[in-house]
């Protein structure tokens, strides 16, 4: 008899659980792991753009701005932002000359 048929056996015209060993520590641990996995999967699907963009581009440091005038820094920031804003649905690789 498989676990599926054992768990989903009709009891008095209702679907119920016949197994009384649900207080087993292994069952409790498996339930906790399953719930955590579900929560992490939902968060991953909701925020995958932010998460993967941060890992792909956020951990890399940009070029050093030491000794560069503030006006040139601001111009560089605007260029970078415009390049990213072109298509928010896709990542844009920028090669500087």
UniProtKB/Swiss-Prot annotation:
One of its GO terms (cellular component) is membrane. The M2 protein from most influenza A strains is inhibited by amantadine and rimantadine, resulting in viral uncoating incapacity. Emergence of amantadine-resistant variants is usually rapid. The modification Phosphoserine is found at residue 64. GO terms for biological process: protein complex oligomerization; symbiont genome entry into host cell via pore formation in plasma membrane; symbiont-mediated suppression of host autophagy. It is found in: Virion membrane; Host apical cell membrane. Residues 60-80 are annotated as: Disordered. Residues 44-97 are intravirion. GO terms for molecular function: monoatomic ion channel activity; proton transmembrane transporter activity. The keyword Nucleotide-binding does not apply. The chain crosses the membrane at residues 23-43. The record marks 37 as: Essential for channel activity, possibly by being protonated during channel activation, and by forming the channel gate and the selective filter. Pfam families: Flu_M2 (PF00599). Residues 71-80 have a biased composition (Basic and acidic residues). Belongs to the influenza viruses matrix protein M2 family. Homotetramer; composed of two disulfide-linked dimers held together by non-covalent interactions. May interact with matrix protein 1. When the channel is activated, one or more imidazole moieties of His-37 probably become bi-protonated. Keywords: Disulfide bond, Glycoprotein, Host cell membrane, Host membrane, Host-virus interaction, Hydrogen ion transport, Inhibition of host autophagy by virus, Ion channel, Ion transport, Lipoprotein, Membrane, Palmitate, Phosphoprotein, Signal-anchor, Transmembrane, Transmembrane helix, Transport, Viral ion channel, Virion. Forms a proton-selective ion channel that is necessary for the efficient release of the viral genome during virus entry. After attaching to the cell surface, the virion enters the cell by endocytosis. Acidification of the endosome triggers M2 ion channel activity. Residues 1-22 are virion surface. This is Matrix protein 2. Glycans are attached at residue 20. Cytoplasmic tail plays an important role in virion assembly and morphogenesis. A lipid is attached at residue 50 (S-palmitoyl cysteine). The record marks 41 as: Seems to be involved in pH gating. It is a single-pass type III membrane protein.
